[in-house]
UniProtKB/Swiss-Prot annotation:
Record's subcellular location: Cytoplasm
Annotated protein name in UniProt: Acetylglutamate kinase
Function: Catalyzes the ATP-dependent phosphorylation of N-acetyl-L-glutamate.
Signal peptide (residue range): none
HAMAP family linked to this entry: ArgB
Single GO molecular function: acetylglutamate kinase activity
Keywords, sorted A to Z: Amino-acid biosynthesis, Arginine biosynthesis, ATP-binding, Cytoplasm, Kinase, Nucleotide-binding, Transferase
Catalytic activity: N-acetyl-L-glutamate + ATP = N-acetyl-L-glutamyl 5-phosphate + ADP
Swiss-Prot/TrEMBL site (Transition state stabilizer) positions: 44, 263
Annotated residues for binding of substrate: 79-80, 101, 203
Family, per entry: Belongs to the acetylglutamate kinase family. ArgB subfamily.
GO cellular component: cytoplasm
Length: 306
């Protein structure tokens, strides 16, 4: 492989950057701002960046800045920890099959309330406070995300199916409501909830929603904020620049496994479907998203379509 790698344990604290370095960063940003002016960026917001108040404020400022310099950010958010907290308060114990939460009627009500009523509105408020014009949506709004029940096959017996309730997979995405908001200078903030043919709600993996939405919007970039530095090789080094073909090789040799699989699969699908670049970024680093997109510095892994 020809990819670049760096030590993933390098100090991510940016507070030591002096005035001269800050000026250099601003100068580096100009060609990127020109290049991406008018382009759409879909951002999956999750992990520590959603729970640390300082990182929340940094994220909101970054999104507003991207909009102000002429880009079109679209935010898709998760909310697993917040859902877990709400269910615990209600005394409802989670039941999992092969790592997936079984989502019955009552759980789905909680999921919808937490994602669309709490988490989404917190994000909208932060972006607006930072000077942006954010609007909260779910996949129901404008008939955006049509979904169906996710079929889960038993990992040991493919002829056996597990019923995991109102966990959905995407049937289609109509991006017209998102495009209309972008045209009016708004920043869409989307909860990953779809609707079925009988108007039932489905909880959908936010990484999957972000990837599919980036594809249908013909986004320039998909940005995934995570709790890890990016894609690591077997020596624990950060791989900063990969092609879709190289990602396939990392799947094949077992370098990418476990909890990173669904995230990387979604990123790979987007890269293969026309999204020019996918960035997997350490959301624990203040302003890492801006630095990754607008400078020559690598603060995560970039997966290129070719």
């Amino acid at each position: 492989m020809t990819h670049s790698s760096v030590n993933a344990s390098s100090d991510p604290d940016l507070s030591h950057i002096g005035p001269r370095d800050k000026a250099e960063i601003l100068a580096q940003a100009l060609p990127y701002i020109r290049k991406f002016h008018g382009k759409t960026l879909v951002i999956k917001y999750g992990g520590n960046a959603m729970t640390d108040p300082a990182l929340q404020a940094d994220f909101a400022e970054d999104v507003v800045l991207l909009k102000l310099v002429g880009m079109n950010p679209v935010v898709v958010h998760g909310g697993g920890p917040q859902i877990e907290t709400a269910l615990n308060r209600l005394g409802k114990k989670g039941h999992f099959i092969q790592g997936m939460r079984v989502t019955d009627d009552e759980t789905m009500e909680v999921v919808e309330w937490v994602l669309a009523g709490q988490v989404q509105q917190d994000i909208v408020g932060l972006i607006n406070q930072a000077g942006g014009k954010a609007v909260g949506l779910t996949g129901r709004d404008g008939g955006m995300i049509r979904a169906k029940k996710l079929t889960m096959l038993d990992k040991d017996d493919a002829s056996k199916e597990h019923d995991i309730g109102f966990v959905g997979e995407i049937v289609s995405i109509d991006p017209s409501v998102v495009k209309a908001l972008q045209d009016d200078a708004f920043i869409p903030v989307i909860s990953p909830i779809g609707f079925g043919e009988n108007n039932e709600s489905y909880n959908i993996n936010a990484d999957v929603v972000a990837g599919k939405l980036a594809t249908v919007l013909k986004a320039e970039k998909l940005v995934l904020l995570t709790n890890i530095p990016g894609v690591l090789n077997k020596a624990g080094e950060l791989l900063t620049d990969l092609t879709a073909r190289e990602i396939d090789e990392l799947f094949a040799d077992g370098t990418i496994s476990g909890g990173m699989l669904p995230k990387i699969e979604g990123a790979l699908d987007a890269a293969k479907s026309g999204v020019n670049a996918v960035h997997i970024i350490d959301g624990r680093v203040p302003h890492a998203m801006l630095l990754e997109i607008l400078t020559d510095k690598a603060y995560g892994t970039m997966i290129r379509s070719h």
